[in-house]
């Protein structure tokens, strides 16, 4: 039978709370609460106070995916610390489906942001004149719908009704998609990021640094360091080896903490990039976010003009 989509979370946690379980889950709750606050503020600013462009649509959806992912993280860690268990396997599988969909959606949004930026740099004329107007909105809808549909089909045909009703062909197809789709997204993310870096440092017409470019690069870097390890444990390890050793369990718990750091890091990145070399005394959060997503190279002249325009009511 094909490997299932359920992550090792429910299968590897000891019955009693020990230090290896207590500390990681407390850290997840702390990082999660910080991330929930940051992503709520980010979602509020992007959704109601800024004019949305192609990149802001992706960033808005990424903030929503991070918020929901952190919420699930906090719920799971709280249940573990309180020794509360879901009443049946169907609810366990539903929870796993939600976590898997949110992880894939976050990776998809990040890949879309990097690819969109790559296209805007490598094909600027096509991007400004020929790109369909509602591409970002349509693509975000597909990004949410596709993994949700596949994971629901996988859970329905592979888990909800027990081994007697398993349809092997559907399980094989959906499991193959769930294992390979994140790999494809990771390859797209890496290739688009490398293309941007190559154009920046090696291209004939070198692209100048913008705050948006720095924001995207830092977001990708944090994901590679903090978000990718959990994907390895969720999508590859169960396929290669079903048995978890003590070391695997410790590494898995570490990857859970790191992914909570990844999901709470983006608002911090935006604040850091938006406030770098700027005085914060008279700047609102909206102005800091606008600065972090600024897509024009900074010169002393336009920095003065931008600060004057933002100071106006």
From Swiss-Prot:
Side of membrane Extracellular, spans: 1-25, 76-93, 159-182, 241-255
Chief localisation class: membrane
Protein topology in the membrane: Multi-pass membrane protein
Location(s), subcellular: Cell membrane
GO MF annotations in UniProt: neuropeptide receptor activity
A cellular-component GO term for this protein: plasma membrane
Cited SUPFAM superfamilies: Family A G protein-coupled receptor-like (SSF81321)
Domain of life: Eukaryota
Entry keywords, A to Z: Cell membrane, G-protein coupled receptor, Glycoprotein, Membrane, Receptor, Transducer, Transmembrane, Transmembrane helix
UniProt-annotated glycosylation sites, renumbered to this chain: 10, 76
Stored InterPro entries: GPCR_Rhodpsn, GPCR_Rhodpsn_7TM, MRGPCRA, MRGPCRFAMILY
Function: Orphan receptor. May be a receptor for RFamide-family neuropeptides such as NPFF and NPAF, which are analgesic in vivo. May regulate nociceptor function and/or development, including the sensation or modulation of pain.
Annotated family: Belongs to the G-protein coupled receptor 1 family. Mas subfamily.
Encoding gene per record: Mrgpra4
Lineage of source species: Eukaryota, Metazoa, Chordata, Craniata, Vertebrata
Tissue: Expressed in a subset of sensory neurons that includes nociceptors. Expressed in the subclass of non-peptidergic sensory neurons that are IB4(+) and VR1(-).
Side of membrane Cytoplasmic, spans: 47-54, 115-137, 204-219, 277-313
Keyword Lipid biosynthesis in record: no
Transmembrane segments: 26-46, 55-75, 94-114, 138-158, 183-203, 220-240, 256-276
The protein, known as: Mas-related G-protein coupled receptor member A4
Pfam families: 7tm_1
Keyword Mitochondrion: no
């Amino acid at each position: 039978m094909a490997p299932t989509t359920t992550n090792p979370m429910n299968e590897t946690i000891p019955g009693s709370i020990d230090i290896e379980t207590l500390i990681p889950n407390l850290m997840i709750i702390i990082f999660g609460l910080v991330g929930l606050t940051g992503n709520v503020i980010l979602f509020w600013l992007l959704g109601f106070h800024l004019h949305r462009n192609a990149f802001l649509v992706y960033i808005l959806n990424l903030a929503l995916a991070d918020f929901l992912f952190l919420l699930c993280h906090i719920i799971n860690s709280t249940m573990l610390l309180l020794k509360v268990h879901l009443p049946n396997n169907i609810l366990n599988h539903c929870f796993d489906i939600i976590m898997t969909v949110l992880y894939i959606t976050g990776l998809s949004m990040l890949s879309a942001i990097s690819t969109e930026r790559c296209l805007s740099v490598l094909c600027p004329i096509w991007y400004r004149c020929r790109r369909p107007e509602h591409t970002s909105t349509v693509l975000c809808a597909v990004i949410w719908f596709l993994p949700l549909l596949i994971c629901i089909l996988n859970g329905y045909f592979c888990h909800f009704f027990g081994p007697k009703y398993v349809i092997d062909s559907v399980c094989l197809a959906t499991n193959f998609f769930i294992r390979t789709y994140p790999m494809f997204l990771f390859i797209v993310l890496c290739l688009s990021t490398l293309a941007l870096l190559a154009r920046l440092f090696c291209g004939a017409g070198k692209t100048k640094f913008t705050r948006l470019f720095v924001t995207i690069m830092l977001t990708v870097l944090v994901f590679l360091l903090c978000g990718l390890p959990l994907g390895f444990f969720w999508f590859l390890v169960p396929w290669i080896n079903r048995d978890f050793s003590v070391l695997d369990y410790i590494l898995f718990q570490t990857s859970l903490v790191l992914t909570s750091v990844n999901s709470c890091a983006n608002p911090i990145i935006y604040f850091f990039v938006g406030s770098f070399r700027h005085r914060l005394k008279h700047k609102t959060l909206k102005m800091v976010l606008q600065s972090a997503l600024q897509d024009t190279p900074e010169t002393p002249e336009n920095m003065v003009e931008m600060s004057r325009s933002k100071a106006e009511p």
